[in-house]
């Protein structure tokens, strides 16, 4: 069924419905994998929510697997905005509520680990400690990205493709908030310039 040494991170070869749609295929072995259908879209659009049908079509038509069993299913939604984070006495928001989600990707897990480490190291003075936040550089870049996404949904597959054409370590560092200025420039230089520049104004 699967090549357990290769994962498919974003497969855009599927119906976009004037939005942004892709599949993940993450094999655990040659016979087991996590397959996910993902939409970046308006939650009010119920036409996008026939997830079971989407997965069935993808598994049978794209992956060419006819005899299979789904052992576990889950659904989720990641908000592509940061809630207002107000520090309260003896209380600190964590995870998505604590603005740990990268708005350009939805990635949160590594940021939660960094935030948890920060809280642990400052637990004795947590009421006097400033709120842990993502680097403002990434917040700025993500906000531009979201504007591009909103105004150019049909171009997003091409944009993601260009980004992932960068060296893998560069992409991983960028997505993990660890990129140097040179790595940032490397990724930005691959992007369609005019589309992004228009979002600055």
Give the positions of each predicted feature:
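Conserved FAD-binding catalytic core of PHBH/FMO-like flavoproteins
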Residues: 1-46
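Internal, well-ordered alpha-helical segments in soluble enzyme and binding-protein domains
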Residues: 6-9, 21, 51, 55, ...
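FAD/FMN-dependent oxidoreductases across multiple families
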Residues: 15-19, 39-118
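Short amphipathic alpha-helical segments, especially helix-boundary/capping motifs
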Residues: 29-33, 77, 90-94, 132-137
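C-terminal helical "tail/cap" subdomain of flavin- and related membrane-associated enzymes
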Residues: 117-201
């Amino acid at each position: 069924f699967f090549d357990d040494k290769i994962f498919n991170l974003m497969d855009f070869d599927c119906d976009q419905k004037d939005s942004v749609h892709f599949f993940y295929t993450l094999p655990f072995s040659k016979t087991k994998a996590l397959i996910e259908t993902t939409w970046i879209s308006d939650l009010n659009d119920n036409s996008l929510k026939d997830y079971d049908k989407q997965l069935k079509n993808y598994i049978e038509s794209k992956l060419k697997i006819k005899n299979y069993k789904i052992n576990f299913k889950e659904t989720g939604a990641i908000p592509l905005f940061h809630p207002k984070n107000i520090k309260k006495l003896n209380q600190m928001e964590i995870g998505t509520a604590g603005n740990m989600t990268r708005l350009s990707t939805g990635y949160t897990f590594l940021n939660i680990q960094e935030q948890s480490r920060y809280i642990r190291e400052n637990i004795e003075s947590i009421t006097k400690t400033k709120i842990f936040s993502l680097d403002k550089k990434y917040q700025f870049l993500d906000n531009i990205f979201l504007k591009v996404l909103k105004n150019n949904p049909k171009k997003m597959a091409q944009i993601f493709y260009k980004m992932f054409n960068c060296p893998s370590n560069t992409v991983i560092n960028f997505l993990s908030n660890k990129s140097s200025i040179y790595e940032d420039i490397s990724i930005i230089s691959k992007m369609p310039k005019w589309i992004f520049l228009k979002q600055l104004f």
